[in-house]
Curated annotation (Swiss-Prot):
Name used for this protein in its record: Seripauperin-2
Membrane topology annotation: Single-pass membrane protein
Superkingdom of this protein's organism: Eukaryota
Compartments (UniProt record): Membrane
Chief localisation class: membrane
Database matches in PANTHER family: CELL WALL PROTEIN CWP1-RELATED, SERIPAUPERIN
Species per Swiss-Prot/TrEMBL record: Saccharomyces cerevisiae (strain ATCC 204508 / S288c)
Example of a GO biological process term: fungal-type cell wall organization
UniProt entry keywords in alphabetical sequence: Membrane, Transmembrane, Transmembrane helix
């Protein structure tokens, strides 16, 4: 006869090996923070390209928090809380390299964090 503690230990072992997943709305702040983290990293890696884009599109503005995060190499995630989801989407999808570079990186980062999104 199998002991209840053996069953519980087996269930706990299975649960520990399964990766946790969370399904969130695309506008959820946790999703936005992952997106903004990828965005800030991409700006740091391709700063000249972003400067050129900004020069060609002077009406495309960024919240000051994004600029501060780009040049602050410490933990910047707390700086980025509170940026409206529609503003996050506008910034990220507004650059020509969104589909080729940002979208795959964001998908990868969300997946790595066990986050899956659903439409709002």
């Amino acid at each position: 006869m199998v002991k209840l503690t053996s069953i519980a230990a087996g269930v706990a072992a299975i649960a520990a090996t399964a990766s946790a997943t969370t399904t969130l709305a695309q506008s959820d702040e946790r999703v936005n923070l992952v997106e903004l983290g990828v965005y800030v990293s991409d700006i740091r890696a391709h700063l000249a390209q972003y400067y050129s884009f900004q020069a060609a599109h002077p009406t495309e503005t960024y919240p000051i928090e994004v600029a501060e995060a780009v040049f602050n190499y410490g933990d910047f995630t707390t700086m980025l809380t509170g940026i409206a989801p529609d503003q996050v989407t506008r910034m990220i999808t507004g650059v020509p390299w969104y589909s080729s570079r940002l979208k795959p990186a964001i998908s990868s980062a969300l997946s790595k964090d066990g986050i899956y999104t659903i439409a709002n």
